[in-house]
Amino acid sequence: MKISDKLLHPDWKEKVTYSYEFFPPKTSTGVQNLYNRIDRMKTWGRPMFVDVTWGAGGTSSELTPGIVNVIQTDFEVDTCMHLTCTNMSTEMIDAALKRAHETGCRNILALRGDPVKDTDWTEGESGFRYASDLVRYIRTHYNDEFCIGVAGYPEGYSPDDDIDESIKHLKLKVDEGADFIVTQMFYDVDNFIAWVDKVRAAGINIPIFPGIMPIQAWDSFIRRAKWSGVKIPQHFMDTLVPVKDDDEGVRERGVELIVEMCRKLIASGITRLHFYTMNLEKAVKMIIERLGLLDENLAPIVDTNNVELTNASSQDRRINEGVRPIFWRTRNESYVSRTDQWDELPHGRWGDSRSPAFGEFDAIRYGLRMSPKEITTSWGSPKSYSEIGDLFARYCEKKISSLPWSDLPISDEADLIRDQLLSMNRNAFLTINSQPALNGEKSSHPVFGWGPPNGYVFQKPYVEFFVHPSLLNELKETVKKLNSVSYFVTNKNGDLDTNSQYEIPNAVTWGVFPNREIIQPTIVESTSFLAWKDEAYSLGMEWANAYSPDSISRKLLVSMMKEWFLCVIVDNDFQNGQSLFDVFNKMRSLKDIHPELYYANAS
């Protein structure tokens, strides 16, 4: 989505917003670390956009579009791609714009840019001498395909710059077609506000995003201020010098200084904060949290025509997507990747399930984003099924924030069924996804609500879990006695058993809204379930492989992934939310049938 369109959207227009800048790392490991960081930062709340820098002289012309593609398509966060014209031919400019457009990126930050290190700037054959030339070229040849941003320099591009003259150059870029301004970093907030007043007086009325540089450490703070030529207010020095040899102290005091600066900006009516992250996250999170913005924008955008299921549209064709299988509820990026080649995405209902072919699960990109050390720190080294059950129970109690099948903490809606989930997991019915019954909750409800205002939302109770083979027959027989309950069961090989009609979707979430058809955003369906099981078992095997080959934990988890069944149960009687869990109250548990398996170490 274009930044200019977002700024007009009611979910963004009146709010304080934030956005991030990242730069392309030089190694593949660095790139993966960046993706992991973005994945974490996305859970804080919804950034308006993420921008990715362009190397001097086009040195990252391959890497920058690739990173933009992953952020836009896989993480479903709207992007803004930097594009410089230094040492760039017209063909290179067109190629970069084409790649950006293909990924769904509709925002370009047009810059002159610096020459490659140890070379002088020369005007290329393309005739791009200034950023205004690039803005004119994009607007002339691509019309309104892109929202174009330009740089603003509140303290001048260099220390000797005439500010009034630089504002004239800024006005030229705006006249050529720029839609928004991202400014150079600064610390003198009073000077910045005065500069904004001058910009407005010059007839420049497009949105301004102030560039906020968090203070991470003393040396980097001084180096960046000197490099960019910005003024450091005396009270910054008075606050930081006493702790300059203490990185934690500098970060803590630096956060307070930046928070104070942001509050002053917001009070003056400047509400679009743009963070230069330097590919780091801790200080940025501290600032956002202390500004009271953490998680504030996490709810999905709802416009007047469509209900979007994701934080931002990854591609224009996903804007109207309205239905997804529930299995990927906590693994959105993987679902987008596996459906990226679909010609049509379901909108009002889930279509013929025989038509879409899910792509293969990309375990390298969408597998566990943790090192073996991080896995053992987070999940320990379980040595029995009882210990695994306790681990899953701790996730349901919010004592740990993730499991292999969910990168996110368990949702607040699960509080309604927490006791039932705890009982299931401690009896070795290992739950990886669930939702409680809802019967006409207001669409504005802070936990359960979604969709347009003045509506009502409904849910069928649903639970997905792994079960030991010795319990499978008893499970199916118990379910069959409850006419309202449907089940789907498969093993690692994909042998499916169900008491439902094959390939017929079962809506498990729906909403009723004024002047609208009923919206059914999540479903359960057999073909999707079989596609999901490949991913579910793969994630479990990745967890196992984090331990040494001869370890008890490795053997235990491998055995579980090879032998246990993956089950989904839906109670179609959503007015009776307890009957689904009555299934497990009527059953024996693994520790009842095989205590030697439940408590014993793997051999």
Swiss-Prot record:
**What is the main EC category here?**
oxidoreductase
Give the catalytic activity: (6S)-5-methyl-5,6,7,8-tetrahydrofolate + NADP(+) = (6R)-5,10-methylene-5,6,7,8-tetrahydrofolate + NADPH + H(+); (6S)-5-methyl-5,6,7,8-tetrahydrofolate + NAD(+) = (6R)-5,10-methylene-5,6,7,8-tetrahydrofolate + NADH + H(+)
* Disulfide pairings: none
**Record has Cytoplasm as a keyword:** no
Summary of the knockout phenotype? Leads to strict auxotrophy for methionine.
**What top-level branch of life does the organism fall under?**
Eukaryota
Q: Which residues form the active site?
A: E21 (proton donor/acceptor)
For this protein, the Enzyme Commission number is 1.5.1.20
Q: Which Gene Ontology terms describe the biological processes this protein takes part in?
A: methionine biosynthetic process; tetrahydrofolate interconversion
Q: Which residues bind substrate?
A: D114, Q184, Y276
Cofactor(s) the protein requires to work: FAD
Record keyword Nucleotide-binding present: no
Where does this protein hold FAD?
T53, W54, H82, R112, G113, D114, Y130, A131, Y153, K173
List the Pfam families hit by this protein, alphabetically: MTHFR (PF02219), MTHFR_C (PF21895)
Which residue positions does Phosphoserine occur at?
Answer: S355
Q: Which UniProt keywords apply?
A: FAD, Flavoprotein, NADP, Oxidoreductase, Phosphoprotein
Described by its record, this protein's role is as follows: Major methylenetetrahydrofolate reductase required to generate the methyl groups necessary for methionine synthetase to convert homocysteine to methionine. Performs 80 to 85 percent of the total methylenetetrahydrofolate reductase activity of the cells.
The entry's family comment says:
Belongs to the methylenetetrahydrofolate reductase family.
Q: What is this protein called?
A: Methylenetetrahydrofolate reductase 1
**Source organism of the structure:** Schizosaccharomyces pombe (strain 972 / ATCC 24843) (Fission yeast)
Lineage at the top is:
Eukaryota, Fungi, Dikarya, Ascomycota, Taphrinomycotina
Q: Name the gene for this chain.
A: met9
